[in-house]
Amino acid sequence: MAKSAKELKSMTLKEFEKAAEQFDNDDPSVYNMCRKDYPDILAELEKEEFTDVLDAGCGTGAVIALLAEKYPGKHYTGIDLSPKMIEVASAKKTENAVFVCGDCENLPFEDNSFDAITCSMSFHHYPHPVDFFRSCGRVLRPGGRLIIRDMTAGPIKLKLINAVEIPLVHLLGKGDVACYGRKDFERFCRESGLKLELFEQRKGFRLHSVMRKSV
């Protein structure tokens, strides 16, 4: 039986509340593997000037800590569903950074607040991906970018993941929702008003994508 959005968010919250204290540990866990995405996120962000950045699904604030070290004087905001993740992120006292507990599908920020939004290995936990895209479009400034790193695969592999692997993951108590392909992202953009500028499948089934708000 398919899980409801409420159930999936509850499972995700439970998973990451439990993981918060060990998320930054140097163990060979799936969380440690997520760090391999950070250089590509920074490289993409660096292609254009920015002042205000939002990291959606920020976890313990690792991406923001890297950005703040490399680009001091900018303004950084992180949002995550897990209060304990936000607690750990805030305890790092990263300069010019604020961390907020909230739902990425309904971002609690003013319109036109950010030059760019990053989202690393969090998007597959969102039950309503179009709501996330629309919320990002609202808080991005004209011409602003949404940069997503996640998992993807070819059409046959994606069907297998979503039909078999995701339900198995639910049995382990994890709230993964789905993995997506290019056609999915094209639809998300059509329904949210964003423009898909880049969609790549990189090594390790990694999705690297860039969406832009019109000027």
Where are these regions (language model features)?
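Conserved class I S-adenosyl-L-methionine
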Residues: 2-47, 62-66, 88, 164
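A short glycine-rich, Lys/Arg-flanked "PGG" loop and its adjoining helix->strand segment in the class I
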Residues: 130-142
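C-terminal lobe and adjacent flexible extensions of AdoMet/dcAdoMet transferase-like proteins
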Residues: 210-215
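Class I SAM-dependent methyltransferase SAM/SAH-binding core
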Residues: 54-56, 60-106
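A conserved beta-strand element that flanks and buttresses the S-adenosyl-L-methionine
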Residues: 118
